[in-house]
């Protein structure tokens, strides 16, 4: 027989491993990498981190490549749990630099590099808004060394990993992954050990931050393992994925064999560092044999008669990790290309030795090689290698060509295959009839038949999921009358899947595929029913007692126990074999009361109750009489419930609760690491009775630490402590069960299999436990793995095997477990014994840490034998049941995408949610197994839906209703499932603190967010999953009592007997009684029926009826025969016998026939009513109390009134009266922006309201204002006043008032402008273009315009003859052509600036200049030097453009093809009708006055910019919402696109030419007092495709500096924007110089200095302003070029060169004619352009204030109260939507016509999601609002919902958007003074229409000016 042996080695040792369930080697991974740190000179530096891996990794620290010597200076520590540190004592200057930490073990090596910065005494200020928490945070800013570094290096990581790809031959395969790391990692793709090179078939590229490998026209030979390796200076990472290539009819080559569990294979492995395997390659891949990492050696002992052999390679388990029970499957060589090779280390090569032996060939078959696995009895035969087939299928045959044999020889393979070159005659196989896909029920007999023709007669094989099927138990394959049959005698669920049949003969082969779906038959549901009920009892204090009852139902009911209607905390409960039992040990007086057993399943609920009386011990003399005395007894505090350690994820909410008993009442304080916690917005304290809670709204890593609760009163004090660990999210997915294991009932001597399928990323480790003890494989017990399926096999089971089995899954993200029971049947056992055994194993069904917290809810298990000693042990474990329940928090980290994928895979939600079984018939055996199959769907819900923390108000609304959890799953686009006829009745809603912990706070997205908050999933779905001790407020469970007598249960049945048990007596069962059959009860009937109703549109509708039934009926509602589900607007509830349906705000579509349907096991009843909804448009005005929802008597002008009959007119609701409850602060009065003359005084007065105490703080530029001799602040209870007595220029700026109280904060801003005469023009006037009698004089604008625009400049002249200053001219621009100068005189010039407030002092004097012939000759020489290739630039007559409103653009120009598009609109080619000249037309859509004003400003700015290097505007037109700018045509394309052209040679000389021109153009812009603010590669255009002339375009973001005062902006392209913009600091001309520096850096190197993986990272890089020339790209670049860039990329804007200095810089002064022209590589530039092209799609210019990492700078301008808090501006949107309390101050409000402070924005949404337009309207009287869709009024409905609140926020929400909603939407606000409108477009992306985005023409912008 043949042996398979896989041999590998490492540098360290050679080993032979048996790949069994022993612990696998795991490469090291830094779970907490050390961070960069800064320390003071002489201080101690400490690098800390944590590493994991197996075996325990060894840590070594290196500096400059050398290991650090340990001693007094360097102290290295490494603990057993992976925590390590490096301490450097007494840090000196020489210690600064980079340190490398290396973690190594047998699994691999991982490195991370960190930097130590040693600072002198002047510590630099750490000011990084992108990385810091929100300003004014609740805790002090952590020390620098503990902050995550944003400028340091970080090792590469895979944010997403490539998945396995399955493609058909000839198709395109694509792997993708997302990587992070700094510096940007280098990416390489390999197949085996061969590096892939780019060619026409293999394309490696990066797109929007995602790395792709694309393989065109995939061949069978391309199959195999592909590895992506990423490397940077901080480390290295790699990940592999498999490409599987299918033949034409193949579906999957890696599926599981039918009903055949795999067995472990012993493999010996040898890992080597580098493969010596070499082959002739093309494209870096071996030409024929593609599995390059595997060498094959065949030792043939007995050759087969045909001298043919098949080569096999091993296939590893799904997760690709060594040692996880790998299995070597026999796969033909050709197929091995599509399978994973074993990955021992990152680089491995494997050797497989195969020894072929003689095998008995089957009749009518070719000779075969049999692959024997060690330790396996059954043999699997594999089809031999076919050498002469005409058509091949990779799963059946691998054709070996002479070329491949040549390759094999080179690879060292000994060959024993003789090729037979004969051409057989005959006919290839053909299917005459094929099997068809079918659906079958479980247990059904299935036959697939196929008829095949061919000559010679074809052989036929059957496959399931690509794996050959063999005859075995329950499977038969045979041929009958020429028809081939596959017979499955009894179908089971596991038989579902894809089947195929293949026929082959020497002439060829063919195959056909089909699907089999096996479904479980439905089982009839039966509501719970008590056959024997609870019986009351009386016990003495300290005794044990047991309550029990018998209950039946299908599916098996959930049992919940209540004491006095409250969930029981400490008792022990079981439910087995229909017996529900509650055991209370050591009864206490508080255990006295009414006990209720509540049984619930999908069909209904039932309950029964009994009274238990606990007699107190007579230890006190007169218990009753001394009760008052007891109350007065004083004692020191004691903790009844203390703190327990918690582990939570970053961003979770945490609640810590203690229970304290003390008299007198104790004082409580909370401490964090010994420091008292103050109550703030983030930390809340709460007291409920004896319970005290600390709420942390959102935890951060710095919240980790020891928390202490101290309680004291005058008699003493006590404390309790616990540790909170905040974990940062791990990449990946928590383990979960694809298919859970089932409980098994077996007879002694049988073999038992317990199987499950699992998933998780990284793939989880699996541990099996029996009764808490880990199982180790041994005699009679095996643990197998086949990919993701794990199986426990128990052979010849005996009574000792019975028990509780647990499967635990773990990975770095989390863990998951599942319990099943194994029970043995004993035929002699009586029913009574079975029940007794069940009671003895009371603890088996409980799993406290598995996810059931709170009201004790237990799984169901049938009874099994257990020895009395085991029983006692179990009881002893349960002894301390009153102790604190341990809390365990498990969170799952998911990307939205992975959640969607996971949900999409869950085709039948019932398989996941509770294994709800719906079958028609069931065998008795099947019914026994059902209880164990009930899964806890709540765990799955928790995984899928992020629970929402409910307000008290919402709890009241939602608590009694049953939420259909299927609607939750359907939310994200899974197929909607029709509502079943039976809706489960309500369940008690008990809040679960875990859902609070798991709730991530997400501010609601505005204006088009498709994310709808998850409905109240907990109210129904998680009701049983909650704890009475939960740290969230828990409303009482709704349990309706209707008993009239304590001794009767809810249904009037007799009460069961309970037992009194001696203190330590053994639990003895009550006398067993035969269980009577469950009674059917009475059918439902309506005691009160529904009444017809007539209701006005917008009013509230309540329908009610009463139902009588026994058992209680399940109730459902329909409208016009369509099922109704509870939703935000429709509330369905059931309280006892009363059922109601409530619609808060009725819409016209709510009219129709409503039916209430009640159903139980005994029957069904229904009643109906009609509801008529009246349209109120024709009725009288609404009542004042309902202003918000009804149309009031309108004050609209006649135009709007006529429209209002078809449209919804919304009136602003009246401000609310002050609520009695506490309210957050509000700013009710605030000053407008102010402008004052210098020296005048100014008062800023604000009124505030809210719950006292309120603190008012005035801030300027994020710093608190301190009082001084000029500034005074007066704060009163409800007002605040800031007074500046004598204003100066430095008092200009934005003043922010922040008001705060315990409930929140508000802020508002006002801009103060101090006006004066301008400053003198900056710098020195400059003379240029000096001729014989003329020159051009130019100058800079004023550095400060005095708060009013500079209107003109006065030029003064001095000459050497007159020797005095005289006025020469007055002009508006910053240049003037001076004429009529005389050659014999010297001249000087100076300039003054004038605004409305006066004329400035004169500027500096110019240099002395003379005019004459010499200068003119030099000018001619310079002109002659212009290079020929530039040619003459197109002459454009400079024009001052005024917008033409009389004509259309088409009257003057012919509009031709479109040249591009962007957010502004589109660009078309225009031809002037008169002259035939070609121009570019930029067509804008401008709906609002603001948009039109912006475009007019752009035209106005371009009128000032007449320069050869700037594109010119020659005409402009305006017609309604369209504005057209006619621009000079620049046809050469973008500069960077020109550079990467094949015919363009890039040298440093070209770079100098381009940078000169850019500097000249920008210099002129600056001289006009203008900043461009959007300099980037896309805005630098080539004049033509041959020369090197360029022009700057796009002045849409340009601003006048001289008229803006201290100008701040919040827009720009992150990659090119300057730090001062991000920090929201005043900008200047230097802001453009930074952008020029970035462009120059990219131009010379092809690398971007600041680009990160996303905008936030890019902005963080810019803010830190750290960059370097370390890359090899700069090796060829001159020092002058580097110096030029260095002088531009300076964080301090004052230190940057200006344009004039740039032009005088040595680099730009170089002689480009004679300088050496060294060719620069364009590869990096090509990559940069490819990445940029993807990145800029749709968002080239971003409003930086909207980026979350820039949250600190948002809300810094704008007048009104923004609703954002200074500590958390990111929540502004959320706070703004709160119902705010505003005091009405009518007498102070002037009448104002409506205007929008926030307009609606264009948006794009996917079909089926929701869209929302938001705006904010101001005006007085309060405006009324109407919405229009394409100029048609919108009527409010379920589809269109309009909200308008008292703050003026108005929104239009469109639910379930469809293609028809793609339109232009307008919001119109009207009052008696006038109207205002704003318009936006909704673009609906229908599915399957991706990739339609056009290129962005010249501009793509989004501007936010506040």
Curated annotation (Swiss-Prot):
Q: Where is the composition biased (Acidic residues)?
A: 1415-1432, 1893-1906
Q: Where is this region: Disordered?
A: 127-157, 309-453, 831-881, 947-1086, 1180-1227, 1414-1433, 1885-1906
Q: Identify residues that carry Phosphoserine.
A: 1762, 1768
Predominant place of localization: cytoplasm
Query: Which residues are in the Fibronectin type-III domain?
Result: 1321-1414
State the residue spans of region: 4 X repeats, motif III: 970-1226
According to UniProt, the reaction catalysed is: L-seryl-[myosin light chain] + ATP = O-phospho-L-seryl-[myosin light chain] + ADP + H(+); L-threonyl-[myosin light chain] + ATP = O-phospho-L-threonyl-[myosin light chain] + ADP + H(+)
- The UniProt regions of compositional bias labelled Pro residues, in chain numbering, are 977-988
Q: Where is the active site?
A: 1574 (proton acceptor)
Which residue ranges are recorded for the region named 4 X repeats, motif IIA? 660-1833
Which GO MF terms are attached to this record?
ATP binding; calmodulin binding; metal ion binding; myosin light chain kinase activity
Domain Ig-like C2-type: start-end pairs = 28-117, 156-244, 429-517, 521-613, 637-725, 735-830, 1084-1172, 1225-1313, 1794-1885
Which Pfam families does this UniProt record tie to the protein?
A: 23ISL (PF16620), fn3 (PF00041), I-set (PF07679), Pkinase (PF00069)
How's its activity regulated? Activated by phosphorylation on Tyr-478. Isoforms which lack this tyrosine residue are not regulated in this way. All catalytically active isoforms require binding to calcium and calmodulin for activation.
User: Where does the Protein kinase domain start and stop, copy by copy?
Assistant: 1453-1708
Q: Where is the composition biased (Polar residues)?
A: 345-354, 384-402
Per its record, how is this protein called by name?
A: Myosin light chain kinase, smooth muscle
Organism of derivation: Gallus gallus
């Amino acid at each position: 027989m043949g042996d398979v042996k896989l041999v590998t080695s490492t540098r360290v040792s050679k080993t032979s491993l048996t790949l069994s369930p022993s612990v696998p080697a795991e490469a090291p991974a830094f779970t907490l990498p050390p961070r960069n740190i800064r320390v003071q000179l002489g201080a101690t530096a400490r690098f800390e981190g944590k590493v994991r891996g197996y075996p325990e990794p060894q840590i070594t620290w290196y500096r400059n490549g050398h290991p650090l010597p340990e001693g007094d200076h360097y102290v290295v520590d490494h603990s057993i749990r992976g925590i390590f540190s490096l301490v450097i004592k007494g840090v000196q200057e020489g210690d600064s630099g980079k340190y490398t930490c290396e973690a190594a073990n047998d699994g691999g090596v991982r490195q991370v590099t960190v930097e130590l910065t040693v600072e002198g005494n002047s510590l630099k200020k750490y000011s990084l808004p992108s990385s810091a928490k929100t300003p004014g945070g609740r805790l002090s800013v952590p020390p620098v060394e503990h902050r995550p570094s944003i400028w340091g290096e970080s090792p590469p990581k895979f944010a997403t990993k490539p998945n396995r790809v399955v493609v058909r031959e000839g198709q395109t395969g694509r792997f993708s992954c997302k990587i992070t790391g700094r510096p940007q990692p280098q990416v390489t793709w390999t197949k085996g050990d061969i590096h892939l090179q780019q060619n026409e078939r293999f394309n490696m590229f990066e797109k929007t931050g995602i790395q792709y490998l694309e393989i065109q026209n995939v061949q069978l030979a391309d199959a195999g393992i592909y590895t992506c390796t990423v490397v940077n200076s901080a480390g290295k990472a790699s990940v592999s994925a498999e490409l599987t290539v299918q033949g034409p009819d193949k579906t999957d080559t890696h599926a599981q064999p039918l009903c055949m569990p795999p067995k472990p294979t012993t493999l010996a492995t040898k890992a080597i560092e580098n493969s010596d395997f070499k082959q002739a390659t093309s494209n870096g891949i071996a030409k024929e044999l593609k599995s390059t990492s595997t060498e094959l050696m065949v030792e043939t002992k007995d050759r087969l008669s045909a001298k043919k052999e098949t080569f096999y390679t091993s296939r590893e388990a799904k997760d690709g990790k060594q040692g996880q029970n790998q299995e070597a499957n026999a796969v033909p060589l050709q197929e091995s290309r599509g399978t994973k090779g074993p990955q021992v280390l990152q680089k491995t090569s494997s050797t497989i030795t195969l020894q072929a032996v003689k095998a008995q060939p089957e009749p009518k078959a070719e000779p075969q090689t049999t692959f024997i696995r060690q330790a396996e009895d059954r043999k699997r035969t594999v089809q031999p290698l076919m050498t002469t087939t005409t058509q091949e299928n990779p799963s059946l045959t691998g054709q070996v060509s002479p070329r491949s044999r040549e390759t094999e020889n080179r690879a060292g393979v000994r060959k024993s295959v003789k090729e037979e070159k004969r051409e057989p005659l005959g006919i290839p196989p053909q299917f005459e009839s094929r099997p068809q896909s079918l659906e079958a029920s479980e247990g059904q007999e299935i036959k697939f038949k196929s008829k095949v023709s061919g000559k010679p007669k074809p052989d036929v094989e059957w496959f399931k999921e690509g794996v050959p099927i063999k005859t075995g138990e329950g499977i038969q394959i045979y041929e009958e009358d020429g028809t081939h049959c596959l017979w499955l005698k009894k179908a089971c669920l596991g038989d579902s899947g894809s089947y195929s049949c293949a026929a082959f003969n020497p002439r060829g082969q063919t195959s056909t595929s089909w699907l089999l779906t096996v479904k479980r038959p439905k089982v009839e549901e039966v509501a719970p029913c008590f056959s024997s009920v609870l019986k009351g009892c009386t016990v003495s204090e300290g005794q044990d007692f047991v309550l029990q009852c018998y209950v039946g139902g299908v599916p098996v009911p959930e049992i919940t126990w209540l004491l006095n209607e409250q969930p029981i905390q400490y008792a022990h409960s079981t439910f087995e074999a229909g017996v529900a039992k509650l055991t209370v040990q050591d009864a206490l007086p508080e255990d006295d009361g009414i006990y209720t057993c509540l049984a619930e399943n999908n069909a209904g609920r039932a309950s029964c109750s009994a009274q238990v009386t606990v007699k107190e011990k007579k230890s006190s003399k007169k218990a009753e009489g001394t009760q008052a005395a007891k109350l007065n007894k004083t004692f020191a505090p004691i903790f009844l419930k203390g703190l327990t350690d918690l582990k939570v994820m970053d961003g979770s909410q945490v609640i810590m609760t203690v229970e304290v008993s003390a008299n007198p009442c104790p004082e409580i304080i909370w401490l964090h690491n010994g420091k008292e916690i103050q109550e703030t917005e983030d930390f809340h304290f709460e007291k409920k009775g004896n319970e005290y809670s600390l709420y942390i709204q959102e935890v951060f890593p710095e919240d980790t630490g020891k928390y202490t609760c101290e309680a004291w009163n005058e008699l003493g004090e006590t404390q309790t402590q616990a540790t909170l660990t905040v974990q940062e999210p791990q990449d990946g997915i928590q383990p979960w069960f694809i298919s859970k294991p089932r409980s098994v009932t077996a007879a002694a001597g049988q073999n038992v299999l317990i199987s499950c399928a699992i998933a998780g990323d990284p793939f989880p480790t699996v541990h099996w436990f029996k009764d808490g003890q880990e199982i180790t494989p041994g005699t009679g017990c095996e643990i197998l793995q086949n990919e993701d399926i794990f199986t426990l096999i128990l052979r010849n089971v005996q009574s000792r095997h019975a028990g509780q089995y647990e499967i635990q899954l773990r990975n770095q993200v989390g863990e998951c477990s599942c319990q099943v029971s194994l029970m043995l049947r004993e035929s002699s056992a009586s029913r009574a014994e079975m029940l007794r055994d069940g009671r003895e194993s009371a603890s088996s069904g409980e799993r406290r840490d598995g996810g059931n917290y709170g009201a004790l809810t237990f799984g169901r298990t049938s009874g099994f034998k257990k020895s009395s000693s085991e029983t006692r042990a179990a009881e002893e474990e349960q002894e301390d049941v009153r102790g604190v329940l341990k809390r365990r928090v498990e969170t799952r980290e998911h990307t939205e995408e992975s959640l969607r994928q996971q949900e999409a895979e869950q085709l039948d939600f019932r398989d996941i949610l509770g294994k709800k079984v719906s079958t028609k018939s069931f065998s008795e055996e099947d019914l026994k197994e059902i209880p164990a199959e009930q899964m806890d769907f709540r765990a799955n819900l928790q995984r899928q839906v992020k629970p929402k923390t409910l307000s008290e108000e919402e709890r009241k609304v939602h608590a009694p209703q049953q939420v259909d959890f299927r609607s939750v799953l359907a939310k994200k686009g899974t197929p909607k499932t029709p509502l079943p006829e039976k809706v489960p009745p309500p369940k008690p809603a008990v809040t679960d603190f875990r859902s609070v912990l798991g709730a991530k706070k997400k501010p609601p997205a505005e204006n088009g967010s498709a994310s709808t908050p998850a409905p109240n999933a907990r109210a129904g779905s998680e009701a049983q999953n909650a704890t009475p001790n939960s740290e969230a407020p828990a409303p009482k469970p709704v349990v309706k009592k209707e008993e009239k007598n304590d001794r009767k249960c809810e249904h009037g049945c007799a009460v069961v007997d309970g037992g009194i048990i001696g203190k330590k007596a053994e639990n003895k069962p009550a006398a067993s009684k035969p269980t009577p059959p469950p009674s059917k009860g009475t059918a439902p009937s309506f005691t009160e029926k529904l009444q017809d109703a007539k209701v006005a549109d917008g009013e509230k509708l309540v329908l009610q009826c009463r139902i009588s039934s026994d058992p209680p009926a399940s109730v459902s509602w329909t409208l016009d025969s369509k099922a109704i589900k509870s939703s935000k607007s429709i509330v369905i509830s059931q309280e006892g016998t009363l059922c109601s349906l409530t619609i808060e705000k009725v819409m016209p579509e709510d009219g129709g026939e409503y039916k209430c349907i009640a159903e139980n096991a005994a029957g069904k009843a229904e009643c109906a009513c009609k509801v008529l909804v009246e349209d109120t448009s024709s009725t009288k005005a609404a009542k004042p109390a309902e202003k918000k929802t009804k149309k009031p008597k309108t004050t609209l002008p006649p135009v709007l009134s006529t429209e209002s009959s078809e449209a919804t007119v919304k009136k602003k609701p009246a401000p609310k009266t002050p609520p009695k409850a506490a309210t957050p602060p509000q700013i009710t009065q605030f000053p407008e922006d102010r402008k004052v003359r210098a020296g005048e005084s100014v008062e800023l007065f604000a009124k505030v309201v809210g719950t006292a105490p309120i603190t008012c703080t005035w801030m300027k530029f994020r710093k608190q204002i301190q009082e001084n001799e000029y500034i005074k602040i007066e704060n009163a209870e409800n007002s605040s006043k800031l007074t500046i007595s004598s204003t100066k220029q430095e008092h200009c700026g934005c003043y922010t008032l922040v008001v705060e109280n315990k409930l929140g904060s508000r802020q508002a801003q006002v801009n103060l402008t101090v006006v004066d005469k301008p400053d003198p023009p900056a710098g020195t006037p400059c003379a240029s273009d000096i001729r014989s009698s003329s020159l051009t004089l130019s100058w800079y604008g004023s550095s400060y315009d005095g708060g009013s625009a500079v209107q003109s400049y006065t030029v003064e002249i001095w000459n050497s003859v007159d020797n005095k200053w005289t006025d020469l001219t007055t002009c508006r621009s910053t240049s003037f052509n001076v004429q009529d100068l005389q050659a014999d005189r010297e001249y000087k010039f100076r300039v003054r600036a004038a605004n409305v407030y006066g004329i400035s002092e004169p500027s500096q004097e110019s240099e002395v200049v003379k005019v004459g012939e010499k200068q003119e000759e030099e000018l001619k020489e310079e002109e002659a030097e212009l290079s020929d290739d530039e040619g003459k630039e197109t002459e454009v007559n400079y024009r001052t453009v005024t917008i033409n409103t009389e004509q259309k653009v088409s009257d003057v120009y012919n509009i031709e093809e479109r040249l591009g598009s962007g957010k502004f609109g589109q660009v078309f080619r225009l031809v002037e009708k008169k002259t035939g000249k070609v121009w570019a037309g930029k067509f804008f859509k401008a709906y609002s006055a603001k948009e039109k004003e912006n475009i007019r400003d752009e035209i106005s700015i371009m009128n000032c910019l007449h320069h050869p290097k700037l594109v010119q505007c020659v005409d402009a037109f305006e017609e309604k919402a369209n504005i057209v700018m006619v621009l000079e045509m620049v046809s050469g394309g973008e500069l960077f696109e020109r550079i990467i052209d094949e015919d363009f040679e890039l040298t440093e000389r070209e770079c100098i030419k381009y940078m000169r021109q850019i500097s000249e153009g920008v210099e002129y812009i600056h001289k006009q007092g203008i900043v461009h603010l959007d300099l980037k590669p896309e805005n630098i255009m080539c004049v033509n495709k041959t020369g090197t002339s360029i022009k700057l375009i796009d002045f849409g973001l340009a601003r006048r500096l001289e008229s803006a005062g201290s100008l701040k902006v919040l827009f720009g392209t992150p990659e090119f924007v300057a730090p001062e913009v991000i920090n929201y600091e005043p900008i200047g001309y230097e802001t453009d110089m930074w952008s020029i520096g970035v462009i120059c850096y990219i131009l010379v190197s092809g690398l971007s200095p600041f680009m990160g993986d996303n905008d936030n990272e890019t902005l963080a890089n810019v803010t830190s302003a750290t960059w370097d020339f370390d890359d090899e790209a700069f090796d060829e670049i001159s020092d002058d070029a580097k110096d030029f860039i260095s002088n531009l990329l300076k964080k301090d804007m004052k230190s940057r060169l200006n344009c004039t200095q740039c032009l005088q810089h040595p680099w730009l002064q170089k002689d480009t004619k004679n300088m050496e022209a060294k060719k620069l590589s364009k590869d990096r530039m090509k990559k940069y352009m490819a990445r940029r092209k993807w990145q800029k799609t749709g968002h080239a210019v971003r409003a930086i204030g909207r980026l979350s990492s820039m949250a600190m700078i948002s809300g810094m301008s704008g007048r009104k109260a923004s609703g954002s808090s200074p500590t958390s501006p990111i929540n502004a949107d959320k706070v703004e939507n709160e119902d705010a309390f505003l005091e009405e101050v009518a007498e102070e409000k002037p009448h104002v016509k409506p205007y929008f402070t926030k307009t609606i924005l264009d948006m794009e949404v996917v079909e089926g999601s929701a869209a929302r337009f938001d705006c904010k309207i101001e005006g007085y009287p309060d405006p009324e609002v109407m919405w229009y869709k394409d100029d048609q009024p919108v009527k409010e409905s379920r589809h269109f919902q309009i909200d308008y609140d008292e703050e003026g926020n108005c929104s239009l929400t469109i639910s379930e958007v469809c293609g028809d909603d793609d339109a232009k939407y307008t919001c119109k606000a009207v009052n008696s003074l006038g109207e205002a409108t704003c318009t936006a477009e909704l673009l609906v992306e229908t599915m399957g229409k991706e990739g339609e985005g056009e290129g962005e023409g010249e501009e793509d912008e989004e501007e936010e000016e506040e």
